[in-house]
Amino acid sequence: MNLRLQFDTTAIDWNQVVEILKKVDMAYYTGEIHQMAFTNSHSVVFVSDDENLVGFGRAISDGAYQAVIYDVAVLPSYQGKGIGKMIVQALVKNTPHCNVILYASPGKEAFYEKENFRRMKTGMALFLDAKRMQENRFTE
């Protein structure tokens, strides 16, 4: 592997972002919507193997004391090689002095627990598609 980390949105193929999200069974939108989300984020990380995008993630933050990590995804063929860990660690490092929260895809909680994230007892959410989030086990 010849991995390269990128910390901006320059020359990203947003269609590849969509395809990776589909392959890992995460929510996806059009490439333009993902471009807007990543461009407007506080911190972004993209990981490529040679010229092929293999993973990414982003954090939104007030830059003072709160941050939220979203859209951490790694191609299935690259999972288990430390790439997700690199993405999460880079996002946490880029939001110093911040509490960092996220919601994990069901079944992926242990991955984040290895990075010292802990389950919250009082987390609440207001989702646009509440039924889908309940069906996908994100909410009770």
Residue ranges and their predicted role:
Residues M1-E32, G123, M133-E140:
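Short amphipathic alpha-helix that is part of the acyltransferase structural core
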Residues Y29-A73:
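A conserved beta-strand-loop-helix scaffold within acyl/acetyltransferase catalytic domains
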Residues K93-P106:
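Conserved GNAT acetyl-CoA-binding A-motif
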Residues Y78-I87:
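Conserved acetyl-CoA pyrophosphate-binding loop and the N-cap/start of the following alpha-helix
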